[in-house]
């Protein structure tokens, strides 16, 4: 049985609605054949935007959010101590935002991961679905609607995550490439060694948000996108990777190694791998999963144990256990690199 089924029975049911009155929800108990009966246009989405000194491009980002075809959207902005005009720009949008409410809160000022974590666990943020958002991208108009349409086919109690490819654009907005097109299925075995998509493409339903919030209450994480992918697949949730680029990721001086399309970015990641940075990230991910073992399915727990053991002992033992665990990256080259990194004890 997927562990999310046990979790939803314990999930806190009281919810705070900040702007609109709560919509009456069906009292019918969910079962595997019970579809989400709330019409897609009635699904309220909370956009969780983390900001810090983003005045240069945040206006274009906000323009693309307002242009979304989905009608019900609340914008939550957690500012991590901006010293430029970011806060003033966001506040100027309050009167223009005609999709719902705009709320601004103070971030924890401990980095972007902690900033997103603060919003994930914030019980004041109440919605049917939640979308992570950066401060300098451009969303395609149907980015939210596409995700909601996919989710409509599932029981509302199943943790769901939608993500997609990204197009990469220059500082001036010209598209210069796309992130790699992945073809392997999303799974926990993939999530253990790879984050499949950027957080700026992720939308999760309420069941997934509650699950990730529970898991995040007792641990910090490396990045919100990777952690969300790990937790949802560990608990038996469903992940959809859309091959279409639904977000244009802006490449600029402050994030030159953030995209997947430039050789500079790839070389930088390779350098971090062999410096042991990836091993440190894996340590943190495994530590977070260990304290949340109760959410793991039996299969995920078995895979986690094998993968954890594969990082210890002699070379042949490590490679044997790694293969037995079944973990994989999305490309053949990536999986070969994974095994090479294991040989050099860099994961």
Locations of the language-model features?
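Nucleotide-sugar donor-binding/catalytic module of glycosyltransferases
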Residues: 31-261
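Generic low-complexity, intrinsically disordered sequence content enriched
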Residues: 8, 22, 39-41, 52, ...
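Compositionally biased, low-structure terminal segments
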Residues: 8, 17-19, 58, 117, ...
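Basic polycationic patches enriched in arginine
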Residues: 10-15, 23-29
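Acidic, Ala/Val/Gly-enriched low-complexity intrinsically disordered segments
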Residues: 6, 19-20, 30-31
């Amino acid at each position: 049985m997927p562990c999310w089924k046990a979790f939803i029975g314990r999930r806190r049911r009281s919810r705070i609605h900040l702007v609109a009155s709560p919509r009456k929800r069906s009292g019918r108990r969910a079962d595997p054949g019970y579809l989400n009966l709330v019409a897609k246009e009635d699904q309220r989405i909370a956009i969780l935007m983390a900001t810090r000194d983003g005045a240069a491009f945040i206006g274009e980002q906000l323009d693309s959010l307002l242009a979304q075809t989905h009608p019900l959207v609340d914008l939550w902005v957690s500012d991590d101590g901006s010293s430029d005009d970011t806060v003033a720009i966001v506040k100027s949008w309050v009167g223009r935002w005609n999709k719902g409410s705009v709320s601004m809160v103070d971030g924890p000022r401990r980095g972007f991961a902690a900033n997103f974590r603060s919003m994930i666990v914030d019980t004041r943020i109440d919605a049917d679905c939640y979308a992570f958002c950066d401060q300098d991208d451009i969303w395609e108009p149907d980015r939210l609607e596409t995700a909601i349409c996919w989710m409509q086919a599932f029981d509302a109690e199943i943790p769901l995550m939608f993500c997609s490819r990204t197009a990469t654009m220059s500082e001036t907005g010209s598209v210069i490439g796309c992130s790699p097109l992945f073809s392997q299925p999303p799974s926990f075995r993939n999530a253990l060694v790879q984050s499949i998509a950027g957080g700026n493409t992720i939308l999760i339903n309420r069941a997934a948000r509650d699950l990730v919030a529970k898991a995040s209450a007792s641990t910090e994480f490396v990045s919100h996108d990777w952690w969300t992918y790990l937790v949802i697949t560990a608990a038996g949730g469903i992940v959809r990777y859309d091959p279409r680029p639904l977000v244009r990721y802006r490449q600029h001086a402050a994030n030159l190694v953030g995209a997947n399309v430039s050789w500079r970015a790839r070389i930088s990641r390779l350098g971090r791998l062999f410096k042991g940075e990836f091993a440190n990230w894996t340590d943190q991910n495994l530590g977070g999963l260990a304290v949340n073992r109760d959410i793991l399915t039996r299969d995920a727990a078995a895979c986690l144990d094998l993968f954890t053991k594969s990082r210890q002992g002699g070379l042949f033992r490590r490679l044997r256990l790694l293969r037995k665990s079944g973990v994989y990256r999305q490309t053949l080259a990536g999986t070969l690199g994974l095994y090479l990194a294991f040989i050099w004890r860099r994961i």
